[in-house]
UniProtKB/Swiss-Prot annotation:
Species whose genome carries this gene: Oryza sativa subsp. indica
UniProt protein name: Protein G1-like1
Keyword terms: Coiled coil, Developmental protein, DNA-binding, Nucleus, Transcription, Transcription regulation
Subcellular location field: Nucleus
InterPro entries xrefs: ALOG, ALOG_dom
Main location group: nucleus
Length: 191
């Protein structure tokens, strides 16, 4: 099997069970197939092993023509307005969030299909810079601020870990005091 080909059910994780793949996995498979088709239709045809960040950028620009997000040009009277009151001739583009998610899925698919992380064209610096530029441009043109989402769950687990560490420190201090005083402390203190 080449890196673009799909694994047979026997090769896939789980051994071909009846469980349906998640929405993310299905989308990742479709994205990978679309990118493989793009490589095959490229003139001259392009092998994945020779694919670079520049080819990924070419693919993202190709996808831009199928976008559904209105991105106002600098000369448009609605530039910077999130909800324009009337239609305008500005082009439809791929939204930054869609491109960012697509690159993330393709980056994962590349490595799942045998690619080395250090040679992953979807993680190239040029691709990251392109996505950042698209985000900034669309943010200004559409009047929408893109802010990084914070992980609430991670913060809650971090607080819990801190509390557990503090309890262990207090228990160790109590054990040291008891030992210094010469009395016995039950082992249940450490559970």
């Amino acid at each position: 099997m080449d890196m673009i080909g799909m694994a047979s059910p026997a090769e896939s994780p789980g051994g071909g069970g009846t469980a349906r793949p998640s929405r993310y996995e299905s989308q990742k498979r479709r994205d990978w197939q679309t990118f493989g088709q793009y490589l095959r239709n490229h003139r001259p045809p392009l092998e994945l092993s020779r694919c670079s960040g520049a080819h990924v950028l070419e693919f993202l620009r190709y996808l831009d023509q199928f976008g559904k997000t209105k991105v106002h040009a600098h000369g448009c009277p609605f530039f910077g307005h999130p909800s324009p009151p009337a239609p305008c001739p500005c082009p439809l583009r791929q939204a930054w969030g869609s491109l960012d998610a697509l690159v993330g899925r393709l980056r994962a698919a590349f490595e799942e299909h045998g690619g080395r992380p250090e040679s992953n064209p979807f993680g190239a610096r040029a691709v990251r810079l392109y996505l950042r530029d698209i985000r900034d441009t669309q943010s200004k043109a559409r009047g929408i601020a893109y802010e990084k989402k914070r992980r609430k769950r991670a913060a809650a687990s971090h607080t819990k870990q801190k509390q557990q560490q503090q309890q262990l420190v207090e228990q160790a201090a109590a054990a040291a005091e008891a030992h210094a005083a010469g009395c016995m402390m039950p082992l249940s203190v450490f559970n």
